[in-house]
Amino acid sequence: MRHHTWLWLAFLPLVWLVGFVALSAQQPKTFKGRLSPVPIDFAMQATIAGSGSVTAVLTGSKVTISGTFDGLKSPATIAQVHKSPVRGVRGPNVLDLAVTKTDAASGTLSGSFDLTAIQVADLEKGRLYIQLHSEKAPDGNLWGWLLPQENKR
């Protein structure tokens, strides 16, 4: 009987650790971004303006993205999630978001996706960003990187 008690005490920390890892893997992680004008030259000043914010919540491999924008000089057309090779550099589109216009200059964006393991890693490393396009700026009007936020306990 005494042997079983020692065996149980030896495996108790392992059981606790496995349970803790399983619980922490499902804790939501929050990412936020500030939408600001894409890099522009003098000729683009008449067409590119605005600001906004975006939040992404990752639970397991599912991400839910929501955001708002305003101050555009023409109506929004599309919003996309792009993957950048490094933060601050444009990259290819990987996901399409829904855009709802409140009026000609403002609106919301949203989407919910099941990410691949590579996309989750890219999100956690700050390689994913949102790009919002508009009628007068079809190559992008606003953009913002999704950066991890610390969970306050």
Residue ranges and their predicted role:
Residues 9-19:
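Bacterial N-terminal signal peptides
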